[in-house]
């Protein structure tokens, strides 16, 4: 639904606050390009950066919603294939679980911008076959303790249907001794990072960027 153009103001603000270079990936969207097409594009982009002399340990991946899922898919893919992983991942209200049956997705299934019906539709259009649900790079909840993941910060919002699955993903990482930190903003909602004209949203974005900068 979004693109480099829609996210350019947000990414530019992040780069200014973090004082770092950010490379945006214009990845192909479903339903025209189903899983794992975007993951393959992301891996190509990562390998291109490495080929240009950027050390993988100096790379951090960041995304919001579906973009956060893609960032985590890359780190899962690297870990599952015993490749060196990136320095860190910063996941802003990530979509993690194709089952769409958490308590928060039921509680906030409508009336909060993102709906349960929309999420079911997104996953249906994203998956190529039902077997994708058993793939650890598609279904993030299938993370296993033999996967060594990078430092992780996960941003959640109180009125987001995806908040519980993101929190459960954070808990799984914590249980297996991965560095993970959850930043929860109880009064906010899915998509707030792109709505910084709202005072509460801007305050939250500035707060989580301060946290992000500390691990870079």
Predicted regions and their residues:
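Alpha/beta-hydrolase superfamily serine-hydrolase fold, recognizing
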Residues: 1-216
């Amino acid at each position: 639904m979004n693109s480099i153009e829609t996210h350019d103001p947000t990414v530019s603000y992040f780069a200014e606050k973090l004082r770092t270079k950010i490379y945006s990936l214009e990845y192909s969207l479903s339903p025209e390009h189903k899983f794992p097409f975007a993951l393959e594009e992301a891996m190509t982009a990562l390998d291109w950066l490495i080929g240009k002399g950027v050390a993988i340990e100096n790379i951090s991946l960041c995304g919001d919603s579906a973009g956060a899922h893609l960032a985590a898919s890359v780190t899962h893919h690297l870990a599952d294939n015993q490749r060196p992983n990136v320095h860190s991942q910063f996941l802003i209200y990530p979509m993690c679980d194709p089952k769409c049956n958490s308590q928060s997705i039921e509680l906030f299934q409508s009336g909060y911008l993102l709906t349960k019906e929309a999420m079911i539709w997104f996953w249906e259009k994203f998956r190529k076959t039902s077997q994708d649900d058993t793939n650890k790079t598609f279904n993030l909840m299938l993370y296993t303790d033999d996967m060594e993941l990078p430092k992780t910060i996960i941003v959640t919002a109180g009125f987001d249907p995806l908040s519980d699955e993101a929190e459960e993903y954070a808990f799984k990482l914590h249980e297996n001794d991965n560095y993970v930190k959850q930043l929860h903003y109880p009064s906010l909602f899915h998509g707030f990072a792109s709505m910084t004209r709202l005072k509460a949203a801007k305050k939250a974005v500035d707060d989580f960027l301060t946290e992000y900068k500390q691990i870079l």
